Amino acid sequence: GFKDWIKGAAKKLIKTVASSIANE
């Protein structure tokens, strides 16, 4: 469902942000 899509997108976004912070 839509909520699952939101959860997946949020996790992906958090991963992306976390890795860019780690690369700083």
From Swiss-Prot:
Belongs to the ascaphin family. Antimicrobial peptide that shows higher potency against Gram-negative bacteria than against Gram-positive bacteria. Has a very week hemolytic activity. GO terms for biological process: defense response to Gram-negative bacterium. GO terms for cellular component: extracellular region. It comes from Ascaphus truei. This is Ascaphin-6. Expressed by the skin glands. It is found in: Secreted. Keywords: Amphibian defense peptide, Antibiotic, Antimicrobial, Secreted. It comes from the Eukaryota.
